[in-house]
From Swiss-Prot:
GO terms for molecular function: 4 iron, 4 sulfur cluster binding; metal ion binding; rRNA (adenine(2503)-C2-)-methyltransferase activity; rRNA binding; tRNA (adenine(37)-C2)-methyltransferase activity; tRNA binding. The gene is rlmN. The active site is at E89, C344. Its main location: cytoplasm. This is Dual-specificity RNA methyltransferase RlmN. Reaction proceeds by a ping-pong mechanism involving intermediate methylation of a conserved cysteine residue. [4Fe-4S] cluster binds at C120, C124, C127. It is found in: Cytoplasm. One of its GO terms (cellular component) is cytoplasm. GO terms for biological process: rRNA base methylation; tRNA methylation. Belongs to the radical SAM superfamily. RlmN family.
Length: 354
């Protein structure tokens, strides 16, 4: 692609391209990220010569929306095409409806599940994304644009709050530089102004980069795709564990700066007759000792060709009750978007006519 992607850049970087004075970058950010304008010609307070320069050098929005599906539970999945015809999927989940309380409208709460790569290198045994292999990293702008589309599409300035989770296609920490820049762009007060406290990075456990992310002091939340409590099983489920075993991941988490009001989220995908027994729950309690933790139990979502099976509700409840009785906050994630393949582990690149 000959032109640069506007959404790839922080305001100070735009100034290096000759976009001066400083207030111009603020105006541009507000047009793009507050008014959702993706055509420089529509920016009324930008000088004509600057518009011409920008049109020649930049495209604003790098994603083309080519498909939109809505599940029976209201979960929405978006398929985007990029300049090279590769595609990524983004999922929007409504967590809480608007409500009227004391005569005031309380905002609805949504979570957008953002992709960071086309495909994935990690190769988790239970995840459909990795079946097609790794294709490429997304740029910061291609990550940011997924959130931009959600805010534009759903008019999020009207009684709607949006949280961002980097839990879509790909391993976020394997695309580290673009991830960090995207976090900063989303948080910029002249733009979408999504605080890092409302952004969660989910990782399968690249221990050195967990430490590096902590040293950035961005204030983001951390989620760990744990899924097993011993290395032998975790290596079968998550091959990355051969490079970074459970102990190294836990050590990195202990060094990660956690807001006193927050906890580290541990995602535990429960697979029938694999990791759903009480002995696994006991080991999990021991493993998380001393870490401010919240465990999110996730039903395995079957897909064509897998031998893994979904656990029953009684087993999930028994596992949850054991953790709670041991003082660990634990929730069971309600699988959303299963009928449109938008649930955990079901996202993948789609073939399109090229």
């Amino acid at each position: 692609m000959d032109k640069k992607i506007f959404m790839d850049y922080l305001p100070e970087e735009l100034m290096e391209f000759g976009i001066q004075p400083k207030f111009r970058t603020k105006q541009l950010y507000q047009w793009v990220y507050r008014k959702y304008v993706d055509d420089f010609e529509e920016m009324k307070n930008i000088p004509k010569d600057l518009k011409a320069k920008l049109k020649k050098e930049f495209i604003i929005n790098p994603l083309e929306l080519i498909n939109h599906e809505i599940a029976t539970d209201g979960t929405e999945k978006f398929l985007f095409k990029m300049h090279d015809n590769h595609t990524v999927e983004t999922v929007l989940i409504k967590m809480k409806d608007e409500e009227i309380k004391d005569g005031k409208i309380k905002e609805a709460k949504y979570t957008v599940c953002v992709s960071t790569q086309v495909g994935c290198k990690v190769g988790c045994a239970f995840c459909l994304t990795a079946k097609g292999g790794f294709v490429r990293n997304l740029s910061a702008g291609e990550i940011v644009a997924q959130v931009w589309w959600m805010k534009k599409f759903k008019n999020f300035d009207e009684n709607k709050a949006l949280n961002v989770v980097y839990m879509g296609m790909g391993e976020p920490l394997d695309n580290y530089d673009a991830l960090v820049k995207a976090i900063k762009i989303l948080a910029n007060p002249d733009g979408m102004n999504i605080s890092p406290r409302r952004q969660t990075v989910s990782t399968s456990g690249i221990a050195p980069k967990i430490k590096r992310l902590g040293n950035e002091n961005l204030g983001v939340n951390l989620a760990i795709s744990l899924h097993a409590v011993d290395d032998e099983l975790r290596e079968q489920l998550i091959p990355l564990n051969k490079a970074y075993n459970i102990e190294s991941v836990i050590d990195a988490i202990r060094e990660f700066p956690i807001d006193k009001r927050k906890k580290v989220m541990f995602e535990y995908l429960v697979i029938k007759d694999v990791n759903d027994d009480i002995e696994s729950a006991k080991k999990l309690v021991k493993l998380l000792n001393g870490i401010p933790s919240k465990v999110n139990l996730i039903y395995f979502n079957p897909y064509p060709g897998t031998n893994f099976k979904r656990p029953d509700d009684a087993t999930m409840k028994k596992f949850q009750d054991y953790l709670i009785n041991k003082g660990i906050m634990c929730t069971i994630r309600k699988s959303k978007g299963m009928d449109i393949s938008a649930a955990c582990g079901q996202l993948r690149e789609k073939e399109i006519n090229k």
